[in-house]
Amino acid sequence: DDDEPSKNDDGVITNQKLLVELRVTDEDGVSITEYSYDSNGKLVSATNTEQYDGSTHTSTYTVTWGANKIIESRNGEAITYTLENGLITHTSDCDGGDLDNTDFTYNANNQLVKLQYDEEDYLSYTWQGEKLTKMAWSFSDEDIHELSYSGKTCKGYLPIMVWSVDDLCPLLEAHPELAGMRCNQLPDKIYSKDEIDETTEQYTYTFDKDGYVESCTEVSTYKRLDNNETRTETTIYTFTWE
């Protein structure tokens, strides 16, 4: 298990622990996603349960693997992922979500460098070695995210890093390597600014005995640019690996 991650023909890492639960807790409530895999370690289904303001909402996702194609369906809606050499190159979403008709581009290290949403709009990723250091949106000069590191790493990967591609996407949370986003470098801070707010997110981590991330605490400080008012929110992510 200490070897370099090894991939099978589907592009899935097979010699590391699998994510079986992701729990997000903040002051408003909790979101829990549970993941189920086949005997080859490929995600086949996931259930997300959100408990906010006294109400519970559950979604079930089903994942179907084909030749160079993966379909993730939920409540009759489906995202289709097209793959080449174990990497997602295109997505289409029948519900017109974030990943409707999006092209994925990678660098020579199979890291994601661009999500092209349409002819004009894209999100670009900048890497320094194994570290994702910057994300920038073409449709806003203001909207840039910069990530800072101090050398912390983990076994496996940090699942929430793939949320910059799309959040609540169980396939990508379970298999971020399919989108070139299997990050084991752990950011200390993510700084971002848009037209309204300046945001600083500080991260601390705990680990299980094998070095996988067990919990991640995110403290977000938002500062309004027009009046310098600040507010702080804390979110705790917990991960269960098997």
Model regions: which residues?
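Buried hydrophobic residues that stabilize the cores of well-folded domains
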Residues: 2-242
